[in-house]
Amino acid sequence: MTRLEQIYREKVVPVLQKEFNYTSSMQVPGIEKVSLNIGLGAASQNNKLMEEAIKELTAIAGQKAVVTRAKKSIASFKLREGMPIGCRVTLRKERMWDFLDKLMNFALPRVRDFRGIPDRGFDGRGNFTLGIKEHTIFPELEVDRVDNPKGMNITIVTTAQTDKEGKLLLDQLGMPFKK
């Protein structure tokens, strides 16, 4: 059991159970999965850029990244159906908890002028999406070896029914939201 998962079971579950008056600990919302996505529009012309993104996302997540391909052809973007346009990884269980721990305690504090995450990334159903401008904040990547910094989306899917439940869950786990 990872450190963050232990915090969830020992501290977060009782707090949420008391706050929302759940009768069973199984009703308490939890984290289902974490999805990481890098979208590279320029990768359709540059194959080296795509390979680099896959390698870096694999290093960050600890799991092999999968190439995402275009569903439709768009002539104005010089895009054909099936061309690679990005890569993604879905983390569950142990790797998910390890990644969230690393994100909250190491990566986010390394962001320049970091004052917390705005809480407007919730989708109305308790899931949270966070955009990162530079993926070099993760300790697995050496800033000197990264040719061009890439942005990425991180989506945390929870079993919460509302944004209030989801925010309290992530807040109790240690997600640094703006006050």
From Swiss-Prot:
The Gene Ontology CC terms held by the record are: ribonucleoprotein complex; ribosome
Q: Does the keyword RNA-binding apply?
A: yes
Per the record, the domain of life is Bacteria
InterPro entries under this entry? Ribosomal_uL5, Ribosomal_uL5_bac-type, Ribosomal_uL5_C, Ribosomal_uL5_CS, Ribosomal_uL5_dom_sf, Ribosomal_uL5_N
The GO terms this record gives for MF are: rRNA binding; structural constituent of ribosome; tRNA binding
Per the record, the GO terms for biological process are:
translation
Provide this UniProt record's keywords sorted from A to Z: Ribonucleoprotein, Ribosomal protein, RNA-binding, rRNA-binding, tRNA-binding
Task: Read off the Pfam families from this record.
Answer: Ribosomal_L5, Ribosomal_L5_C
What does the subunit section of this Swiss-Prot or TrEMBL entry state? Part of the 50S ribosomal subunit; part of the 5S rRNA/L5/L18/L25 subcomplex. Contacts the 5S rRNA and the P site tRNA. Forms a bridge to the 30S subunit in the 70S ribosome.
Role: This is one of the proteins that bind and probably mediate the attachment of the 5S RNA into the large ribosomal subunit, where it forms part of the central protuberance. In the 70S ribosome it contacts protein S13 of the 30S subunit (bridge B1b), connecting the 2 subunits; this bridge is implicated in subunit movement. Contacts the P site tRNA; the 5S rRNA and some of its associated proteins might help stabilize positioning of ribosome-bound tRNAs.
- UniProt record similarity statement: Belongs to the universal ribosomal protein uL5 family.
The identity of this protein, by name, is Large ribosomal subunit protein uL5
Provenance organism: Nitratidesulfovibrio vulgaris (strain DSM 19637 / Miyazaki F)
